[in-house]
Amino acid sequence: MTSLSVHTDSPSTQGEMAFNLTILSLTELLSLGGLLGNGVALWLLNQNVYRNPFSIYLLDVACADLIFLCCHMVAIIPELLQDQLNFPEFVHISLTMLRFFCYIVGLSLLAAISTEQCLATLFPAWYLCRRPRYLTTCVCALIWVLCLLLDLLLSGACTQFFGAPSYHLCDMLWLVVAVLLAALCCTMCVTSLLLLLRVERGPERHQPRGFPTLVLLAVLLFLFCGLPFGIFWLSKNLSWHIPLYFYHFSFFMASVHSAAKPAIYFFLGSTPGQRFREPLRLVLQRALGDEAELGAGREASQGGLVDMTV
């Protein structure tokens, strides 16, 4: 990650440096909280992975966010310390590769979740009868493999990680990334709009929303918090001009995007008046829409937060 710090004694620059340091410090703290939240979500989702196919998606999303936040925290340390600590080029490139890889994986998984949930809501009979048993597992595996391939191609063409870079191929690949980012965003917007219309106008509008609401909130979270980081990547590699403050702002919003998802899961699944007093496992099940198992689970909820096992 190239340092964009400007060292000068002018008052305006001193103000910018103070602002940037504040944003980066908040980013570190938020990333630390996100690591804890995603770690808990990852552990709980692993207990529930065979009960709900959508939990497989969220398990992969939590894994991608966990890796992203780890790399994100480490990568901004030189910026936070005003370049008093510099990583070797190998570490710098590796952190860049991993962050971009996890970002694209998370975006692709979110598009897959919104698409499958839209199909399940619009065509429930077809979805239950025709859906392949291992569809979710295959889609997740395909996303990880294809995103890894794209990341390796970009690393080989745009850096010296695997040898001499090819700048012409690098520009072409980043144009492909721009098209991919636009296509995934359009997919999420269209499927989320259809899902919202179905939820608000369908016969089930007075029933508990559960997972469809979670998907809608996750898409909104990406559009407002995750998308700026993608724009930063494109502007950096396609020579678009962006203000310096947007550079650090996109870092902060990327941390918000990855750290806020576990909070959405638990607040959406918690019962008003019982928040922070229910077992986290039951809260997550409710957010996933596993209402069938919650009847017996409500009795167990008297055990408190420590009851987190299946």
UniProtKB/Swiss-Prot annotation:
Side of membrane Cytoplasmic, spans: 44-60, 114-133, 196-213, 270-310
PANTHER family: MAS-RELATED G-PROTEIN COUPLED RECEPTOR, MAS-RELATED G-PROTEIN COUPLED RECEPTOR MEMBER E
Origin: domain of life: Eukaryota
Assigned protein family: Belongs to the G-protein coupled receptor 1 family. Mas subfamily.
Residues bearing glycans: 20, 237
Gene3D superfamilies listed in its UniProt record: Rhodopsin 7-helix transmembrane proteins (1.20.1070.10)
Residue spans, topological domain Extracellular: 1-22, 82-92, 155-174, 235-248
InterPro entries found in the cross-reference section: GPCR_Rhodpsn, GPCR_Rhodpsn_7TM, MRGPCRE, MRGPCRFAMILY
An example molecular function term from Gene Ontology annotations: G protein-coupled receptor activity
Keyword terms of this UniProt record: Cell membrane, G-protein coupled receptor, Glycoprotein, Membrane, Receptor, Transducer, Transmembrane, Transmembrane helix
Species annotation: Mus musculus (Mouse)
TM region(s), chain numbering: 23-43, 61-81, 93-113, 134-154, 175-195, 214-234, 249-269
GO CC aspect terms: plasma membrane
Membrane topology field: Multi-pass membrane protein
Descriptive protein name: Mas-related G-protein coupled receptor member E
Subcellular location: Cell membrane
